[in-house]
Amino acid sequence: YSIGYMHHDPDRPRFFAYLSLFTFAMLALVTADNLVQMFFGWEGVGLASYLLIGFWYKKPSANAAAMKAFIVNRVGDFGFALGIFGIFVLFGSVNFSDIFANAATYIPAEGTTGQTVLNFLGYELDKQGAVTAIALLLFMGACGKSAQFLLHTWLPDAMEGPTPVSALIHAATM
């Protein structure tokens, strides 16, 4: 569909380069076996989305939409990055296999008192509080990328890009 739609656009090589970058970043995101690699794919998807939304950069509305998408996604990415850092502090690893293998040790036993395992924004968190805080930070990242609750304002503006971009971004965020 993109080939026919972009056939008469003189900048189609740039469009397909951005589209290839998006595809590469999405593949890096979904095939990652650790959180750092996943984060690089995550950021690549955000960068490629910014480039694709602002493809027609001579239109002020396309530039504004691209900047809005970029900034709102950075808010979610900040939460995601803090969540990854929290996981590293708790588990000492960012590999999914290590995290999943040790996750059961962070389920609080009945009747145990909370030992501080994480200091976050001046709060001393026990195991249960730390896992909850990390889950909320990761959720914040997911909300930013998938245009959910309060971080959704960029998605309607993404229609400023070419139609194939709008379809791709709306499908990728759902």
Regions of interest found by a model, annotated:
Residues 1-174:
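...captures the hydrophobic TM-helix bundle architecture rather than a specific catalytic motif
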